[in-house]
Every structure is written in C-alpha cells, then in structure tokens.
C-alpha cells in the first residue's frame, strides 16, 4: 500500500485531460458580460444589451454564445475588420443611432451564414461598403444615412438584401444630379433613372475633351511647322536674290571648225 494521502491514477478525484478542455470551453462560452451591459441568458443563448452606454468602440469581451447584440444609441464611429468574428451564433446585430462613418471590408467576417438582421440605420454612412455587406444574407437597414447617390451605390444595392420595411426611407442626401437630392433612392431608381449612365456620360465627355485637346495641339504644331518652313524658304529665296549675278560676255561666238 502506498503512502497515506497519495491518490492512484484511477482515482475519481483526479481530473482527466478531456475534462480540463471542457472546463476551458465552458469558460469561453460564459465569458464575462461587457462592463455596463446586461447579458440575460435564455437556455444557453445570450442576449447582450449595451444600448445607450456611451460606447465609442465595439466591446471585445462579448460572450461567444451571443445571439442578440444591441449596440444602438452609442457613439461608435467605426466598425473595424473582424469585430464580430468570434460570435458564430449571432443572429441579430443592432448598430443603429450611432456615428458610424467607416466600415472595414472584413468587419462582418464570420457572420455571413448565420446573421439574420443587421441594423445600420441612423448613422453617418455616405458610401455603402460593398465588400463588407455584399456577402451577408441578412436583412439590412440603411435608412437615415447621408448617402451620396452615385453609380457605386446603385451597383452595391443590387447585391444587398434590404429590409423591406425600411427601404423606402433610404434617401439621397447628396447626388451629382441635384434633382435627386432628398428623394427616396428606390423611387429614383424605379423611375428609370440611372446614376451609372450619368457616370458613363461624364466619362465620355471627359474623353472627348481630352481628345479635342490633343487634336488642337496637333493642328497647332502642323500650322507652326508649315509657317516655319515658309519663312525659311522666303529667307533662302531672298538670300539667292542678293547674290551678285555673273557678267554676260558680249563677244560674238566663233564658228565651230
């Protein structure tokens, strides 16, 4: 018998390696709730409520089993790349009523398949980040943003699944065509207008102006070249006229024998 107090390897009190991994996994799932937020747990699914907390950036200590994340009514100005990549179970993300101006191209990486609703309304977004939103299958709310209506916006909208309940509230805050400013974007597009055709016309005009400029330069060079040659020819002729002529002999020619 071994010394008193030593436990055999088969003792039930000795934790196995597998149980250690299980404990670590559970700790990861049960990560602490972000400071000043509320994280009610419903049957293992966590809803994180961080509304109106004065947050300036997205919290990093969000539980991995979060299914609902409310970050609305804060002061968040940007969404960096990979901000939610550790939240594979996230189904609804509310970022409305913030000051978001910039969204990284990989800001929503890891959410493409599971996310069902993304609320970006009431922010400061001027241009739609096509790379960030184009791969999402979630319904997206973009109303009440100072959008600049242009060809890139029109092309991006074709790839997004916009929320039908708020799509009529997406308006042109600015536009290259003044008649569309302040009008609902869907109404403008349904009328047959196209920001891309305007973009192509602008490009064509710029190309024509450039070609006309080159043509004018070529014509000016040809005119200069001709006039320069004419001036040289005139000077050469005057020089020849100024040369003394050879005296003409007045003696009669002798007959050839």
Curated annotation (Swiss-Prot):
Start and end residues of each LRRNT domain: 33-64
Signal peptide extent: 1-32
Gene3D superfamilies: Ribonuclease Inhibitor
UniProt name for this protein: Leucine-rich repeat-containing protein 3
Taxonomic superkingdom: Eukaryota
Subcellular location(s) of the protein: Membrane
Ranges of residues in domain LRRCT: 145-198
């Amino acid at each position: 018998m071994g010394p008193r107090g030593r436990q055999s390897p088969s003792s039930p009190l000795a934790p196995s390696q597998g149980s250690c991994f299980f404990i670590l996994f559970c700790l990861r799932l049960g990560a602490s709730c972000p400071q000043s937020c509320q994280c009610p747990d419903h049957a293992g699914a966590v809803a994180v409520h961080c509304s109106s907390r004065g947050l300036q950036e997205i919290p990093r200590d969000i539980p991995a089993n979060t299914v609902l994340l409310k970050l609305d009514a804060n002061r968040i100005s940007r969404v960096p790349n990979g901000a939610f990549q550790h939240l594979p179970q996230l189904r609804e993300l509310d970022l409305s009523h913030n000051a978001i101006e910039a969204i990284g191209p990989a800001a929503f990486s890891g959410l493409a398949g599971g996310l069902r609703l993304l609320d970006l309304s009431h922010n400061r977004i001027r241009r739609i980040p096509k790379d960030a939103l184009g791969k999402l299958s979630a319904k997206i709310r973009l109303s009440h943003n100072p959008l600049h209506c242009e060809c890139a916006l029109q092309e991006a909208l074709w790839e997004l699944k916009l929320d039908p309940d708020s799509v009529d509230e997406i308006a042109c805050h600015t536009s290259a065509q003044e008649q569309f400013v302040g009008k609902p974007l869907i109404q403008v597009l349904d009328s047959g207008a196209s920001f891309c055709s305007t973009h192509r016309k602008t490009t064509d005009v710029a190309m024509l102006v450039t070609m006309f400029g080159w043509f004018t330069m070529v014509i000016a060079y040809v005119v200069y070249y001709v006039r320069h040659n004419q001036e040289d020819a005139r000077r050469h002729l005057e020089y020849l006229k100024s040369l003394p002529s050879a005296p003409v002999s007045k003696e009669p020619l002798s007959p050839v024998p």
